[in-house]
Amino acid sequence: MSLVAVPVAYMPLVDAAPLIIAQEMGFAKAEGIALELIAAPSWSSVRDMLAFGRVDAAHMLSPLPVAMAMGLGGVATTLSAVSVLSVNGNVIGVGKPLEEALRKTGFDFDFKDPFRAAKALQKVRSGPLIFGVPFPFSMHVELLRYWSQATAIGVDGIEIRTVPPPLMASALEAGDVDAFCVGEPWGSVAVEQGKGALLLPGAAIWNFAPEKVLAVRKDWAETEPNLLGRLMRAVWRAGRWLSDPDVRATTSDLLSRKAYLDVSAELIDRALSGHLMVSERGEQRKVDQFLEFHFGAASFPWTSQSKWIAQQLQQFHSDGGSCKIDAATKVFRADLHRRHLNFAEADLPNASDKIEGAIRHVTPVASSGGLLSLLPNQFFDAHIFDKSEK
């Protein structure tokens, strides 16, 4: 059978797994497509490859297409986020000087309490903390700002500096940044190289944050609906496959290949299992749902998530007006997700938005298959975000 090539850009991160697995484990082939996976050196490269037609789809930071719809970042192409590729998966960490200063105060790197971590940082900092992040329009930045704004650090207590994920450990060593927020495995790489320690999982700030999305150009989605559906189904089935704990070893081995992440399988397994080593001392911490690809409708692009992102962006970018917020909330395409995954045994929620922060326990919801439950989506400060509120 002749396969249709679909070029896809991605960054070398554990949360690119649904794309890699879709190709490597035959889910793409079953849909009659072959994913041409193109590793990019930076998120701006991923954006540009998609925006200017070098690729048809991309592994993308969830706030990036929203920011583009708001006229931020200088690239005007309209993108659609047709699926969420991953939920959570980031780590917040500090370089060696901050780690040593924190330990002198008795801080034990519990890896779970955002208020305690912020209070400890406030005690030892002498000025704004420079955080390395992968891109200005990223969940990393939004989580850092949300955390700092609600704690002792304060929104003026951090400065943001862009560092490509694979270079985060080098930036710490050079003293270019004091701390970081990055996707795995690059936080664990910094720990393994003795360049820093992990302070918090991103999930400690918002415990069901949409991290990466499957993004396509809006016009491509309209002109290639059949191809889009085949791509979405292959990736969704890969995410479902990844939800089985028994496939972790296979996944780690595949992702560790030089063609993909080119780091040890053991480091990749830390993210997949949620068993993270937070310092070179060997201190280990377990985080439930550290990185989620499937359960709890993880892949569903909720319009409430896109509105939360848009409002966060508007708060820090004065050129993102209310009219642009309306356009931005249409970037997460629940309609396309529902249309194309009706053919993939997916149990999809009947609603397209939810109240972010309100789900405290596993909660059954009305769905196409009648068996769907959503996972907790709390913010650490107990804030509730209702999309219907202006």
Predicted features along the sequence, with ranges:
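Secondary-structure end/capping motifs
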Residues: 227-333
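General small-molecule cofactor/ligand-binding pocket signal
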Residues: 36-38, 159-163
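Short acidic loop-to-helix transition motifs that present clustered carboxylates
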Residues: 41-43, 163-166
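Conserved C-terminal helix/tail region of periplasmic/extracytoplasmic solute-binding proteins
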Residues: 307-390
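Ligand-binding pocket segment of bilobal, Venus flytrap-like solute-binding proteins
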Residues: 55-56, 164-198, 217, 258, ...
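Short, glycine-/small- and polar/acidic-enriched structural segments
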Residues: 4-153, 178-188, 195-208
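Extended ligand-binding regions for polar small-molecule ligands
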Residues: 27-29, 96-112, 211-265
